[in-house]
């Protein structure tokens, strides 16, 4: 497997958007992610209420969408899962992410409500040999996962064992 570049920059509220642009350059984003493919942005909503450092912040979503639009990406899907503890629609609202999507003419898509299809294991051996279900929206798409560095309630117990 080809090694990919990793980039880290110190940022500030004043330089955040230009820093994200620079990070994409350092990570050779344009060599890897292409505007002529469907692009899925995997948003991270850990809790439906707003807790700083817990979910995708609006400025991160805004910065990546700004860069995608600048690069003429058209087919963009902003998605998140439905979980037993999180209502993603409420989370999109309380975390101010809907406002960002509206700014770029996009809407939120809940993966649980979209179509699903069977993935043949010969397509991706990482997951084992049995068939797996996958959201239809990610078939043939490039996925950008918006990372959130955080602790989880299980981490203390898991790391202590």
Language-model features: locations:
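N-terminal and secondary-structure boundary signal
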Residues: 1-161
């Amino acid at each position: 497997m080809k090694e990919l570049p990793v980039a880290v920059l110190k940022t500030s509220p004043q330089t955040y958007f230009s820093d994200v642009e620079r990070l994409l350059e350092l990570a050779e984003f344009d060599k890897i992610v292409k505007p002529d493919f469907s692009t899925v942005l995997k948003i991270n909503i850990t809790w439906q209420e707003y807790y700083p450092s817990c979910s995708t912040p609006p400025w991160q979503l805004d910065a990546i969408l700004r860069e995608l639009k600048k690069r003429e990406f058209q087919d963009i899907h902003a998605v998140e899962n439905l979980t037993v503890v999180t209502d993603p629609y409420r989370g999109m609202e309380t975390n101010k992410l809907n406002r960002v999507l509206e700014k770029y003419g996009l809407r939120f898509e809940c993966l649980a409500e979209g179509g699903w299809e069977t993935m043949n294991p010969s397509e991706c051996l990482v997951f084992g040999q049995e068939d797996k279900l996958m959201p239809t929206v990610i078939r043939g798409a490039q996925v950008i996962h918006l990372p959130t560095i955080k602790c989880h309630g299980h981490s203390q117990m898991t790391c202590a064992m």
